[in-house]
UniProtKB/Swiss-Prot annotation:
Cofactor: how and how many bound: Binds 1 Mn(2+) ion per subunit.
Chief subcellular location: cytoplasm
UniProt cross-references to Gene3D superfamilies, sorted A to Z: 3.90.228.20, Phosphoenolpyruvate Carboxykinase, domain 1, Phosphoenolpyruvate Carboxykinase, domain 2
Entry protein name: Phosphoenolpyruvate carboxykinase [GTP]
PROSITE patterns the record matches: PEPCK_GTP
Enzyme class per UniProt: lyase
Binding site for Mn(2+): K233, H253, D302
EC number: 4.1.1.32
Binding site for substrate: R85, Y224, G225, G226, S275, N400, A401, R402
GO process annotations (BP): cellular response to glucose stimulus; gluconeogenesis; glycerol biosynthetic process from pyruvate; oxaloacetate metabolic process; propionate catabolic process; response to lipid; response to starvation
Subunit (UniProt): Monomer.
Length: 622
C-alpha cells in the first residue's frame, strides 16, 4: 500500500497493519498539499511517547520535571499569543448558513476550502507529519467513533496519547473500510532549509474549521489545547453533536459520575456546567463527614456521549460513555483542599502547560498552596517572586494553564468508566454561576421544563458587586461555544429525544438545575459548595427513589430544609432560605432576558419553549 516519492512528497511509509486504502489515499493527499519533510505513523507505544517527549525537551518545547517530584512528567510553555481556544476564529461551515445558526461563525464551505487550501499549501515544510489514529470512547464500543488527526506537532501526538485511546489498535477496529473523522492540524509555521525552529511554533492567523456534512476538521495556526487536540471540543462536541442530531443521540459538554448509596445501590448522573463552575471538582467529589457510606466515582469530567438502547429488562434507557481517556483540566485553583482527587491524579505521567516551575523542578500555580514559593520561573520563562507579583500583578501560571493526565490514574475512577456499553443515566444536572435569582437546586416537573431550564441557563461573566447583578452570559446547556449546528435545532433535538424515550415507555432521567454560587447581602457565598454538594446530590437520589416530597414553586420542585441531610454541617434554616428562595421581581426580569435569547434564536425555535415560558409567567402572576 506504499506509494513512491512524488512531487517532493516524502514516501508514505505505511505500516503493514494499516489496511485502509481510503485512509492511506487521504494521508497522501494531505501530504501533497502540506509538503512535510517526513511522515510518521504513530503507534501509541510508550517507546514512541518517550522518544517524542525527549525530542521536545531537546528542542526546548518541554522541560522534564524532577522525577522524584513528578515521575515521567513534563512542562511545556506556549507562545504568549497562543494560550486558549479562539472562539472568534472557530467556524461551522455547513452547506446552509441557517444550519450553523446565529451563535456560530459561518463561511460558505467552498469559500472556506479555498482559504484553507492557500493556508495549508506547504504549511508543514521542514516538519514531520504525524498520523495520529484515535478512538473517542472504548475501542469497539457501540457508542464510540474513530478519528485520525494529521498534525505537524509532536505536542499534539503525545497529548492525544493521554487524552484518547490512541495507537495501533485503532486500525484493527477500522479494518479496510471503517468510518473515521478526518482531522488536519498545522501550527502554520513552515521551516525553510536550515532555518532554526522556535520552542513553540504558531501563526498569528488562526482558523479552526468544521465541515459538519463531511465530518471534517481543519485547524491552522495554533498549537494549543482545544485548537490543536482535535478529538476534544472539535470532534467530541462540534462534529459529534451534528452526528447525534442525524443519528438520534446526544454529544454533551457534561461530566459523568456514579453515586453509590450506603445500601450499595448505584446511580449515574450527567451534569453540564459552563467553564469556571466546578465541573471537574463535582466529577471528583468526596462526600463530607456526616454522609458516611456514600461514595462518588468519576466516569468523565468534561464530555459525555449518550445513546438510547434497551437494558437487560428490555427498557429503553440513555447510556453514556466518556469519549476521552484523560483530563485536560485548568490548573489554577486546583488544590488538595478544592479537589484532592485531581491532585492525586497529577503525581506522574502528566504534561503541564503554562504553569510555573519551582526551583526544585516541580510545578506550581495560583491556588495550589496558600503561600507561594519564594522564587519561581513563571509561564513566560521569567523570574517570579511574591514581591514582583505584588508590584506588577503578574501571575506565575497563566489563568488557563492546563494539565493533561491519564483518567486511569484518578483515585475516584469508576470501575465502569471504560465499559464499552456505557452507564445508564438516572439524572441530568444543569448549573451556572449566579449570585442571585437562581435557587440552589430545582427539579423540573417534566422533560420540557427541564429543557427550558437548560436552554436558558447562564453564568455571570463579571464579579457582581453587592446588590448588583453581574452580566449574565447565556450558555444554553453549557454548549454555546461547542454546538456544531443551529442552537434552536439543538433544543428541538433534545425535546425529540425525550419524546422518543417517552413513546417507548421509558422512565426519563430527571432533570435538575443547580446554583452553588448564591451570595448574601455582603457579597459572600452562602452555600459552602465542594464536598457539601453531596447533600444536594443525595436529595436528587431521594427524589429518584420517591423518598423526598419537595416543595413545588414557580420554577419546579425544590427541597424543604428538613429533606437535606445536615449531619456534620452547621447550616441554618435561615441560611437555607437565602439559597433556595425565589424573588418574583427578579424572576420577571430574568424571564425578560430569556425573551432576548429566544428572539435571537427565533429561526427554528421549538414552540414548546415559549409555551413553557408563558406557563412560568402565569405562575408568577404576570
Amino acid at each position: 500500500m506504499n506509494q513512491p516519492v512524488m512531487q517532493g512528497v516524502p514516501a508514505l511509509n505505511v505500516p503493514d497493519y494499516v489496511k485502509h486504502p481510503r485512509l492511506v489515499a487521504w494521508v497522501g493527499e494531505v501530504a501533497a498539499l502540506t509538503k512535510p519533510e517526513r511522515i510518521v505513523w504513530c503507534d501509541g507505544s510508550q517507546e514512541e511517547y518517550d522518544r517524542l517527549c525527549a525530542e521536545m525537551v531537546a528542542a526546548g518545547t518541554m522541560k522534564q520535571l524532577n522525577p522524584a517530584k513528578r515521575k515521567n512528567s513534563y512542562l511545556a510553555l506556549s507562545d504568549p499569543s497562543d494560550v486558549a481556544r479562539v472562539e472568534d476564529r472557530t467556524f461551522i461551515c455547513s452547506q446552509k448558513k441557517e444550519d450553523a445558526g446565529p451563535t456560530n461563525n459561518w463561511t460558505a464551505p467552498a469559500e472556506m476550502r479555498q482559504t484553507l487550501n492557500g493556508l495549508f499549501d506547504g504549511s508543514m515544510r521542514g516538519r514531520t507529519l504525524y498520523v495520529v489514529p484515535f478512538s473517542m470512547g472504548p475501542l469497539g464500543s457501540p457508542i464510540a467513533h474513530i478519528g485520525v488527526e494529521l498534525s505537524d506537532s509532536p505536542y499534539v501526538a503525545v497529548n492525544m496519547r493521554i487524552m484518547t485511546r490512541m495507537g495501533r489498535a485503532v486500525y484493527d477496529v477500522l479494518g479496510t473500510d471503517g468510518d473515521f473523522v478526518p482531522c488536519v492540524h498545522t501550527v502554520g509555521k513552515p521551516l525553510a532549509a536550515g532555518e532554526k525552529d522556535v520552542p513553540w511554533p504558531c501563526n498569528p492567523t488562526k482558523y479552526i474549521v468544521h465541515f459538519p456534512e463531511t465530518r471534517e476538521i481543519w485547524s491552522f495556526g495554533s498549537g494549543y489545547g482545544g485548537n490543536a487536540l482535535l478529538g476534544k471540543k472539535c470532534f467530541a462536541l462540534r462534529i459529534a453533536s451534528t452526528m447525534g442530531r442525524d443519528q438520534g443521540w446526544l454529544a454533551e459538554h457534561m461530566l459523568i459520575l456514579g453515586v453509590t448509596s450506603p445500601e450499595g445501590k448505584t446511580y449515574h448522573v450527567a451534569a453540564a456546567f459552563p467553564s469556571a463552575c466546578g465541573k471537574t471538582n463535582f466529577a471528583m467529589l468526596i462526600p463530607p463527614a456526616g454522609l458516611n457510606g456514600w461514595k462518588v466515582t468519576t466516569i468523565g469530567d468534561d464530555i459525555a456521549w449518550i445513546k438510547p438502547r434497551q437494558d437487560a429488562n428490555g427498557k429503553t434507557r440513555l447510556y453514556a460513555i466518556n469519549p476521552e481517556a484523560g483530563y485536560f483540566g485548568v490548573a489554577p485553583g486546583t488544590s488538595e483542599k478544592t479537589n484532592f482527587n485531581a491532585m492525586a491524579t497529577l503525581k506522574e505521567n502528566v504534561i503541564f502547560t503554562n504553569v510555573a516551575l519551582t526551583d526544585d523542578g516541580d510545578v506550581w500555580w495560583e491556588g495550589m498552596t496558600d503561600t507561594p514559593p519564594a522564587h519561581l520561573i513563571d509561564w513566560q520563562g521569567q523570574d517570579w517572586t511574591p514581591a514582583s507579583a505584588k508590584e506588577t500583578g503578574r501571575k506565575a501560571a497563566h489563568p488557563n494553564a492546563r494539565f493533561t493526565a491519564p483518567a486511569a490514574q484518578c483515585p475516584s475512577i469508576d470501575p465502569e468508566w471504560d465499559n464499552p456499553a456505557g452507564v445508564p443515566i438516572d439524572a441530568f444536572i444543569f448549573g451556572g454561576r449566579r449570585s442571585t435569582t437562581v435557587p440552589l437546586v430545582t427539579e423540573a416537573r417534566d422533560w420540557t421544563e427541564g429543557v427550558y431550564m437548560a436552554a436558558t441557563m447562564g453564568s455571570e461573566t463579571t464579579a457582581a458587586a453587592a446588590g448588583q447583578q453581574g452580566v449574565v452570559r447565556r450558555d444554553p446547556f453549557a454548549m454555546l461555544p461547542f454546538c456544531g449546528y443551529n442552537m434552536a435545532d439543538y433544543f428541538a433535538h433534545w425535546l425529540k429525544v425525550g419524546e422518543k424515550l417517552a413513546d417507548s415507555g421509558a422512565t426519563l432521567p430527571k432533570i435538575f438545575c443547580v446554583n452553588w454560587f448564591r451570595k448574601d447581602e455582603n457579597g459572600k457565598f452562602v452555600w459552602p459548595g465542594f464536598g457539601e454538594n453531596m447533600r444536594v446530590l443525595k436529595w436528587m437520589i431521594d427524589r429518584i427513589e420517591g423518598q423526598a416530597q419537595g416543595e413545588e414553586h414557580v420554577f419546579g420542585v425544590s427541597p424543604r430544609y428538613e429533606e437535606l441531610s445536615w449531619d456534620g454541617l452547621d447550616f441554618t434554616a435561615e441560611q437555607f432560605a437565602k439559597v433556595i428562595s425565589l424573588d418574583a421581581d427578579a424572576w420577571k426580569q430574568e424571564l425578560a432576558l430569556h425573551d432576548e435569547l429566544f428572539t435571537k434564536l427565533a429561526h427554528g425555535l421549538p414552540q414548546a419553549l415559549p409555551d413553557a415560558k408563558t406557563r412560568l409567567e402565569e405562575r408568577l402572576g404576570g
